[in-house]
Amino acid sequence: MQPSLLRSWVTLPEDTGFPLENLPWGVFSTPDRDARIGVALGDHIIDVRMLSERGFLGGCGVSAVDLAAPRLNRMLEGGKGAARALRIELQRLFSAACPDLQDRPDAQHFLVLQAESTMHLPVDIGDYTDFYSSEDHARNVGMMFRDPELSLIHI
């Protein structure tokens, strides 16, 4: 793992997989916060809905309604550009060089410890088909890796 080039005002573990360069989207809840969009940062989760409700993400091209949703679907409908703009703004807000959040007395309210959170399925999946459940597909895949006579493994 390469060291992070961006510095955050949030204390991050040295070996974190979630520095400012890698902010993955997800959905989380806590006992006092219902399911909402969040982004991992170190061993924390950034509460995106709370940031949006406080007016920090207004210029990113994603509506506050979409960011308040309990799933990522509405946000993702905005395309890569919207997600990229949000990620760039989160990098700016949580950068050590940006005073916008870090100088606020309530700055820690925008963060939740991952260990105290429950993660949820991040999107509503509308129409998934498992093609491998078809015997024909299983046979065709089996022939790619085994002798055609042994394409299906019978247990």
Question: Regions from the language model: what does each represent?
Answer:
Residues 1-27:
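Short, Gly/Pro- and small/polar-rich lid/capping loops
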Residues 15-16, 47-50, 58:
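Helix-rich terminal scaffold detector
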Residues 32-34, 61:
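Glycine-rich N-terminal segment of FAD-binding domains in flavoprotein oxidoreductases
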Residues 38:
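Short beta-strand-centered aromatic/proline hotspots
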Residues 58-120:
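Glycine-rich, N-terminal phosphate-binding loop and its surrounding beta-alpha-beta segment
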Residues 126-133:
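Extended, domain-scale alpha-helical bundle/helix-rich regions
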Residues 137-145:
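Short active-site loop/helix that positions an aromatic residue
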Residues 153-155:
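Conserved small/polar residues in nucleotide/adenosyl-binding loops
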